[in-house]
Amino acid sequence: MKVLLIGSGGREHALAWKLAASPLLEKLYCAPGNPGIAAVAELADIGVDDHAALIAFAKEKHIDLVVVGPEAPLVTGLADEMRAEGIRVFGPSRAAAQLEGSKGFTKDLCARFNIPTGAYGRFNNAPKAKAYIRQQGAPIVVKADGLAAGKGVVVAMTLQEALDAVDSCFEGAFGAAGAEVVVEEFLDGEEASFFCICDGKTALPLGSAQDHKRVGDGDTGPNTGGMGAYAPAPVMTPEMVARTMRELIEPTMRGMAEIGAPFSGILFAGLMITSDGPKLIEYNTRFGDPECQVLMMRLNSDLLALINAAVDGRLDEVSLEWKDEPALTVVMAAEGYPANVKKGSVIRDLEKLESIDGVKLFHAGTALKDGAIVAGGGRVLNITATAATVAQAQARAYEALKLIDWPEGFYRSDIGWRAVEREKANR
């Protein structure tokens, strides 16, 4: 099969690596890709938002399957446009991608189909949003309705913080994404990410992960797209997984079909595990980044065969095989991230990681300049490891990371701390 993968991050490098291992694969292309992906795929210099050029490329190369990595092209309807041209594509329709593209859409769906989530209000102007906030009190959560690259959420611990968040949304901090805000109840508990692959009818669990959103050690500093992750999430016990499928995922699949937008693709539930059980924080309609990296490290099954089954509506025939060991990934980011990122610094000694057992390096925001690997974005490298325990995977990842010569890079030194503490307590 000839496959076109769309995207350029660490998530896409992990997908490319796994797709390249499939015996079904004849040729892998990636648009636009990155220097790490170039080792397993032929790169095409086409941006993820250039739908017409992506469609033309898929036709020219007789592509059998398109796999869409990031959320933005899905929310703007790339999958629909490709299907209209007769191209097989893995990813939700524009209508189904509203689960990620509009927080308000998802909250309304939860209300209609009795999916557990926090109480909420939707507002298209600041005075009404502020009145609701004053009525509810803090802590409270303020979210831009649309796509804001994981940065449009403020968990306000004080009333003033919440009111300021409303102002920044309506003053255009997130562009069109902030034209409407969702204000919702603060949920107390432990967060987890839960992933399913879906074919419109069936949702097959791909397991859980926990990511680390804040930039600094001890969960301090501003939110980011994610500074590291591990899988599985210990809080997602077999009972919690069963409840999540029964109370959240299955009603969502039924609800989306009922409103005429059946969901196929990756459904990523951001959960809060509360004393009452799982509640939905948000849905994403693609793999998480960096959660995808740890899921791919643990997946033994053929990813391409799995995606084919999803595209063909055959997931009810599929069973998956996973490694028993946990996986953990640490993000190395460029100086200044998540604010003003300094690009162009040279990264050396990456080849030293190639021979380490149980370690895989995924490229995210890397670029090639004069034959050298340089920082081309905010989150740049993902050092990923598997081992018998999370503590051992953590040690392995940090040991490998220290071999990289990149003074301008930084990372959190405590990725996996929750699971490591649990392991110690359970000894």
UniProtKB/Swiss-Prot annotation:
Q: Give the ATP-grasp domain ranges.
A: 107-312
Amino-acid biosynthesis: present as a keyword of the record?
Answer: no
Q: In which pathway does it act?
A: Purine metabolism; IMP biosynthesis via de novo pathway; N(1)-(5-phospho-D-ribosyl)glycinamide from 5-phospho-alpha-D-ribose 1-diphosphate: step 2/2
GO biological process per UniProt: 'de novo' IMP biosynthetic process; purine nucleobase biosynthetic process
Q: Which family does it belong to?
A: Belongs to the GARS family.
Listed PANTHER family: PHOSPHORIBOSYLAMINE--GLYCINE LIGASE, PHOSPHORIBOSYLAMINE--GLYCINE LIGASE, CHLOROPLASTIC
Q: What class of enzyme is it?
A: ligase
Q: Keywords, A to Z? A: ATP-binding, Ligase, Magnesium, Manganese, Metal-binding, Nucleotide-binding, Purine biosynthesis
Q: Which InterPro entries does the protein's record reference?
A: ATP-grasp (IPR011761), ATP_grasp_subdomain_1 (IPR013815), PreATP-grasp_dom_sf (IPR016185), PRibGlycinamid_synth_ATP-grasp (IPR020561), PRibGlycinamide_synth (IPR000115), PRibGlycinamide_synth_C-dom (IPR020560), PRibGlycinamide_synth_C_sf (IPR037123), PRibGlycinamide_synth_CS (IPR020559)
Q: PROSITE patterns attached here?
A: ATP_GRASP, GARS
Protein's name according to its UniProt entry: Phosphoribosylamine--glycine ligase
The coiled-coil segments of this chain are none
| ATP-binding in keyword set | yes
Q: Name one GO molecular function term.
A: metal ion binding
**Originating species:** Brucella suis biovar 1 (strain 1330)
Amino acids binding Mg(2+): 282, 284
Indicate which residues the UniProt annotation says bind ATP: 133-193
Bound how, and how many: what does the cofactor note say?
Answer: Binds 1 Mg(2+) or Mn(2+) ion per subunit.
Please list the disulfide bridges. Answer: none
In short, the EC number is 6.3.4.13
